[in-house]
Amino acid sequence: MKSAPFVALAFVISFATTTKAAETSSPNPVDFSPAARRAIAAPYLAEVDAEFRRFAEEKRLPGAVWGIVIDAELVHTGTFGLADLDRRAPVTKETRFRIASMSKSFTAAAILRLRDEGRLHLQDPVAKHVPELAATPPVTRDTPPTSIEHLLTMSAGFPEDNPWGDRQLDVTDETFRDFLAAGVSFASTTGTAYEYSNLGYALLGRIITRVAGLPYQEYIRRELLAPLGMKDTVWDPRDVPAGKIALGYQREGAAWLPEPLLNDGAYGAMGGLVTTLPDFARYAAMHLAAWPPRDDVESLPVRRATLREMHQARMPSGFAATEKSLAGEPQPNVSSYGYGLVWNLDSRGTVRIGHSGGLPGYGSNWRFYPDHGFAVISFANLRYAGTSAVNTRVGAILIEKAGLPRRPVIVSPILQQRSREVADVLIRRTAAGTPEPFAMNFFLDHDRERWRREADDLVQMLGKIEAVSNVQPVNALRGTFQILGEKGSLEVFFTLTPERNPLVQELKMKLRRAGG
């Protein structure tokens, strides 16, 4: 299978000095509601469709379908071409596609759900649940036992197996058992390197079956697909009503040749799911709903904290040094494999998480942007269609051109309090006897009298003080605010301690002249 700093607007508050400071105008806060973001995206959806259609034509795809999810809603879909060339049946948004390795995160979610139920541990040796693997000795005597987590993160040491693994999809449980009992080969020492392995995810399927006491397909259907309302998602293409599935093709010269459609089998856990765009959008919405962390009652098939575990960088898997933004500016990114998902961070600080899928006859990709609250999904019925590239461009259109915002960071009460206290210290508004907001290290790191002189000099350069902005949080214990004066502004960055009553451990100031 082929895989592939928050900014919150400042509310400006006025304060009284010897003469009353004027209020500055307060910019509007970010409206992160689904309706507001739908309105931002709407004028660019025609460009999104044009991007997908251009890709489909350039790649000569038989057919394709794509969609945009914002929070819990599939807000836009588009289609291209044919699901069945002989019947000239067009692709619709309800057409079933095999999504290949996009299935892996379902398998990972099932493993983590069993972990949450106390039925397995991620550090369990795989051989505890798949005794047939005990026939394979470790690479070296000091190699750790291959664990469930090694399988999840593609670090078991098995060789990359895309061409071979893609043809194993329909092998029987008995054939798979015999294969394992004969022993398997390693390409690298367990736990030391990333290498993409379909075998690893087939083993995870076998673990689910053993631990749950029912086939992994049924466990995932019962615990994930059914609760999400994914009624048109199945493991075996034979379960799709006649005429409802996109047939897979490969290209030979100018011709499209049909690819055989493999039935479900022991390797399905690595890439066997068949689904529709609306069904998969429900799954994408579940992952989006894991963000931000909050106190709400749990309502998803998998705990929100567990989903966020899946979304973390676990095993470094790539560095794209030459990537560029839509405007052509350098925008390198790094990627890591998590639990059934690929985590990616670019030089703007934008995080995207998702997975590609590729099989003989099919190619697909999805990614979601947890800080922006949207997802991009696309399926095609051409062998290894590689829709990751177009999904990347569409994500960039929605962020860079449309301007979909990042989710604002909520200002913690202590951060707001300390910002006001620091401002009072800097502009000498602190009453005698008021406790300092500084931690015990602060005036060990800075000579008190020299720091006071330097701070006074900077504040005096502002001229008449007009306002202090609300703090712009980086997180609950770190942020920036500005002291605004007639001759410029003073940007103040500060970080609080991990104490029960957090105090200021670090503070940096930067003067910005008016008109500079």
Would you name each region that the model predicts?
Residues 19-24:
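Boundary at the C-terminal end of the N-terminal hydrophobic targeting segment
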Residues 1-7:
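Bacterial N-terminal signal peptides that target proteins for export
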Residues 80-85, 138-358:
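Short, surface-exposed loop or secondary-structure junction motifs
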Residues 7-16:
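Bacterial N-terminal signal peptides
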Residues 354-355, 365-368, 372-381, 491-493, ...:
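Short, well-ordered beta-strand elements
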Residues 37-99, 119-121, 132-136, 173, ...:
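Short, conserved catalytic-motif segment at the N-terminal edge
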Residues 315-324, 350, 378-450, 515-516:
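Short, gly/Ser/Thr-rich active-site loops of penicillin-recognizing serine hydrolases
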Residues 332, 453-499, 504-506:
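Surface-exposed, charged secondary-structure patches
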